[in-house]
């Protein structure tokens, strides 16, 4: 077809697929798990439409299946669907576990980014506060001191005690975790997020890192370089 509009972003491609295959794709809300091999089905069904290329379809599928709402839908008992919404088998346990880990890691990244941004804002606010001087109070003129009579003996001035220099705040030092195999379940440690360190408890030692639980109740897998005592 001539003069077809071109989709320029993966989000636009996803919106097109949700309109073209409403029983398979969704533009909002919890998404349904897709049939394995659905990429080839898409190539066969929408080849040439909207000037879509295989690269655009592959990028849109990658964005769609890595979104939080799609990962939420990958859960035990969920059924995969094809382009027309027909069931294509129940999800396997390994796929459910993989999606759960992806979701936890994504949430942890977002939380770490927020903590880092908040720390930078605090530092910027503190720096700005040091530069801005407080408004000065208008000084009242001092009354003139009475003149000392000639020949009167001067009293020695009392020396002012030297002002003590303010103590610098003690910086909390953390010891990095060098060997995760030495950790034990239930052990308390901290997870580094930017300039902050969040309290956590060891739940499990895995090949990918250490599964910990934060004080908020959230559990996530963290690599050794982000763990300190």
UniProtKB/Swiss-Prot annotation:
Question: Which cysteine residues pair off into disulfide bonds?
Answer: none
Q: Name one GO cellular component term.
A: cytosol
Q: Name one GO molecular function term.
A: RNA strand-exchange activity
Name the residue ranges with Basic residues bias: 137-146
One GO biological process from the UniProt record? post-transcriptional regulation of gene expression
Question: Which InterPro entries does the record match to this protein?
Answer: ProQ, ProQ/FinO, ProQ/FinO_sf, ProQ_C
Q: What is its main location?
A: cytoplasm
Q: Where is region (Disordered) located?
A: 105-178
Keyword set, alphabetical order: Chaperone, Cytoplasm, RNA-binding
Q: Which SUPFAM superfamilies match?
A: FinO-like
Where are stretches of biased composition, namely Basic and acidic residues? 117-136, 147-176
Keyword Chaperone (UniProt): yes
Gene3D superfamilies associated with the record: ProQ/FinO domain (1.10.1710.10)
The question of whether Cell membrane is a record keyword is answered with no
Compartments annotated for it: namely: Cytoplasm
Domain of life of the source: Bacteria
The entry assigns this protein to a family as follows: Belongs to the ProQ family.
Q: What is the protein's known function?
A: RNA chaperone with significant RNA binding, RNA strand exchange and RNA duplexing activities. May regulate ProP activity through an RNA-based, post-transcriptional mechanism.
UniProt cross-references to PANTHER family, sorted A to Z = RNA CHAPERONE PROQ
Stated name of the protein:
RNA chaperone ProQ
Origin organism is Escherichia fergusonii (strain ATCC 35469 / DSM 13698 / CCUG 18766 / IAM 14443 / JCM 21226 / LMG 7866 / NBRC 102419 / NCTC 12128 / CDC 0568-73)
Q: What is the lineage of its organism?
A: Bacteria, Pseudomonadati, Pseudomonadota, Gammaproteobacteria, Enterobacterales
